[in-house]
Design a protein with these regions (language model features):
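C-terminal solvent-exposed extensions
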Residues: 306-328
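Small-molecule pocket liners
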Residues: 46, 106, 114-123, 206-207, ...
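Pocket-lining segment of extracytoplasmic ligand-binding domains
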Residues: 91-93, 102, 177-270
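Short, solvent-exposed loop/beta-turn-alpha elements that line the ligand-binding surface or hinge
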Residues: 59, 115-116, 214-224, 288-299
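Bacterial N-terminal signal peptides that target proteins for export
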Residues: 2-15
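C-terminal segment of classical bacterial N-terminal signal peptides
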Residues: 21-29
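Secondary-structure end/capping motifs
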Residues: 238-314
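Short, glycine-/small- and polar/acidic-enriched structural segments
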Residues: 33-161, 169-172, 188-194
Length: 328
């Protein structure tokens, strides 16, 4: 016959085991959802670091895991191979090209505009080179931000200013080399991006000739919005974990709201991106807008930009950009 002492001991052990299993179940139920985010660490990645470091992902039970990637092709490749669920800052041309090859792969929850107010792409000229406008670059040796899209845009802007191929030399150059190339005088001018422009001007090695080039020369107005990049979720993420995707978008929207009204967000650039501390307080930022807040006019300008790219031969066929804007 089992003694009272043994019965009590066995009961206690059983209750302990049940309690442990219950706690494990609770912990599992409350575990944050992991979301892998591909991040190209430049200024346009700012919303990710604001949402992460201000606890906005944590507030919606998301464990955001950064996958550092350099450039659009790397981000798209990681989306295809399911190594990331989200691309924090993917060029829209790259996104639409990916959707032509694999429809529904890239879905933007927010997009970023740039123009003369929200500066990004800029033609610069080195110190000592005689040019006061883009039209003065005939005979110049010009560097460009890398990739087919940037080369196409540089040529389009030069053509709009009366310069045809053969009137200049154009070489694509990795972005980290732009500032030193201007300092060394390796190139006379450049189609470059922020924060390189601000760095060059602060150093005195180059000056800006004109910024907001896509808005002016592609969309036809200085104050137009060129929707050139944005934050995209994979179609599989949206299909398989719609609630997590919705919570991610909510955290992202909070970060965008902070960027619009709180200049202290710039502190997140210094330790997380290629932006040096000296220029973080003044470097221009693009205009971050959630897809749900886009007006009909915004969508029309977005379509106009992508149509221009298609007509230029970079995309193989027309794309309806609204198909790949995701709202919740």
């Amino acid at each position: 016959m089992m003694s009272f002492r043994n019965l009590t001991r066995r009961t206690a052990l059983t209750l302990t085991a049940v309690a442990a299993l219950s706690l494990t179940g609770i912990a599992g139920a409350n575990a944050a959802d992991n979301v892998k985010v591909g991040v190209f660490p430049v200024t346009s990645a700012l919303p990710y670091f604001v949402a992460l470091e201000r606890g906005y992902f944590k507030d919606v039970d998301i464990d955001a895991e950064m996958v550092r990637l350099i450039g659009g092709p790397a981000l798209v490749a990681a989306m295809i191979t399911k190594d990331i669920d989200v691309a924090a800052n993917l060029v829209t041309i790259e996104g639409m090209n990916a959707n032509l090859k694999k429809p529904g792969l890239v879905n933007y929850i927010s997009i970023n505009s740039q123009n003369k107010q929200y500066k990004m792409e800029t033609f610069v000229v080195r110190k000592g080179f005689d040019a006061t406008s883009i039209a003065d670059l005939k005979g110049a040796k010009i560097m460009s931000a890398p990739g087919p899209a940037n080369i196409m845009m540089a040529k389009a802007v030069l053509a709009a200013n009366g310069l045809k191929e053969g009137d200049y030399q154009l070489d694509q150059l990795a972005m980290p080399q732009h500032v030193t190339a201007m300092q060394a005088g390796t190139y006379d001018a450049g189609y470059t991006l922020e924060p390189a422009v601000t760095l060059m001007e602060n150093q005195g090695s180059a000056k800006a000739l004109e910024s907001g080039l896509i808005a002016t020369y592609v969309l036809g107005k200085d104050d137009a919005d060129a929707w050139v990049a944005g934050t995209a979720l994979t179609g599989e993420f949206l299909k398989d974990r719609p609630d997590v995707a919705k919570r991610f978008a909510a955290a992202w929207a909070r970060a965008l709201a902070d960027i619009a009204k709180d200049n202290t967000v710039r502190s997140h650039l210094v330790k997380n991106t290629f932006t040096p501390e000296a220029v973080a307080p003044t470097v221009p930022l693009v205009n971050f807008v959630m897809a749900e807040n886009l007006s009909d006019g915004d969508k029309a300008e977005y379509q106009q930009f992508i149509d221009f790219v298609t007509d230029s031969g970079v995309l193989s066929e027309k794309v309806d950009v609204t198909k790949y804007l995701k709202t919740f």
